[in-house]
Amino acid sequence: NWCYDANSKFKWNVSKKSNSLKIQYNKGFDIKVPWELSRLQSLSKICVWSFLNKKKNLYTFIKNQVFDFIASNPPSYGVNWFNGMEVAIRGANLCMITDILIQENKLLPRERRIVYNSINDHMNFVINNLEWSPFSRNNHYLANIVGLLVMAYFLPRDENTLGILKFAENQ
């Protein structure tokens, strides 16, 4: 479950709009637990390790995890679409995972379209939810920009991706 804190057994509601969720602190559960899992960083590590060590038997597991995340976490709903930094990190990891799966011929054309659409959803969420302030720039904004660069560079070129790529390059 992508919205679950296994330490406290608390589950966030995936059917609530992300912008309506309230972060609660000191209640015995930690929103960062599902965020860490949902960044897909561990899946990226498994994917890179599989690629470097020619362990093709793990690609089915990796694909299943990617498609489970996409199916279980609709854009702008639930805890995993709460802020741009989390979405940007996950989007960049999806790009790396997808690139390896494509190189290894492990994605059918329809599967590739599903993942591309999800990455596009991630990119559009980030560009529409930049964590920018006129008073300071922080790690969240940096993650937003780096994620946008990776996603816009990775996706097929169109007017939207080119515009986002140009924006991110100029930050």
Residue ranges of model-derived segments:
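N-terminal transition regions in large eukaryotic proteins
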Residues: 1-27, 32
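Aromatic-lined, polymer-binding surfaces characteristic
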Residues: 14, 24, 30-171
